[in-house]
Structures are given as C-alpha cells and as structure tokens.
Amino acid sequence: MGMAENRLIDAPVCHVCASPSCTNRGDKCPGPVTASPRATALQYVQLGWWVIPLCWPDARGKCGCGRGHQSQNVGKAPLTKHGVRDSSDQVILISNWWTKWPNANIGIDLKRSGLFVIAPDSPEWLDHFAAKGLTPTVVVKSGGGEGHFHYYYRRPPDAPIFRINRSSEYDIQSDGYMVAPPSRHVSGRIYLWI
C-alpha cells in the first residue's frame, strides 16, 4: 500500500486554540484554553483514542511521580504496571487514573487507537514524504524544542503494525505510544497541537 492511500485523521484542530475538541472553531474561539490532563485524556477517548497516564516532570525537570525515573524517562514513563498494555478507552478507569495522578502526562496508544505518527528530524524529510503522496494532517509540536513535530495519521485497517527508528532522520511509529498535549516535557515546554 502506498503512502498516498493514507487518510487524514478525522480530528481537525482549531487554528486558534490548537485543540482537536474545540467546538467554537476559528473566529468564534476564545483562544488557547489550558484544559486539565484528565479532561484532555477524556476528550481523546471521545475521538476513539486509547490513553495511558505517564510520569510528569516537576518544576526542576526531575521525576514528579515519585518513582525516581531518570532524565530520558521523565515525562514519558507509563505509571501503570504493564505500561502501554494497560491503555484504556474506559471513562471511569481514566478518571480514576487522573484522580490518583492529577499531573500525569498523557500517552496515546497508537496501535489500539488506529494511528501512526511520523516524527521527522528535519524539514527535508517532510518534503520527501510529501513527494510520496503523504497528505497534510494534524501536528503536535513536541516538547523537545524547535524542529520536533509529530504528524498524526489514521492507520488503514490493513496496514502493518510497526516502528521504524532512524534516529538521525525520522521515526515512523504505529506501535507503542506517543506523549500527547498538554503534557509537559522534561525541559518544561508543553506539547501543543498546532
């Protein structure tokens, strides 16, 4: 199956507040709203996505969940016993997670949500994928700083589940999870829909 056959995700993002769940769209939107992680996780479930609570960084960029995660896992490590295998789309369970861990970052289970993400490390790779017929989609500016973006696509039902990590070029992932807005990166920056 060619890249051109991939469909856009069915969750347009408001260009004013950058939220996939904005009901005011465009000029009627009051602007960026900081929803709680719990409220946002529940909004993702309404989109048909499965979520998982993740560790969060404290004000110093250290592990905020109290489990002593090291720097590369702060803000990214799952808080449940079985990690991404515990992801859920059940409102009561998700509400309980964020009642227990109100500051938890949000992870989106790509496989169960039927998504795949492309994370290029340079703008040239976007041109490469566009030349292959990959259409525009919703985008997350990750907390990793300038030039770090996640391009979300709906995975066709017959597409394989995979993870390609070409760390100096790009990552393509339809397995595992991605950290999602409004999560906080260890740097203190917030993941944002753009």
What are these regions (language model features)?
Residues G2-I194:
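Conserved phosphate/metal-binding and DNA-contacting active-site motifs used
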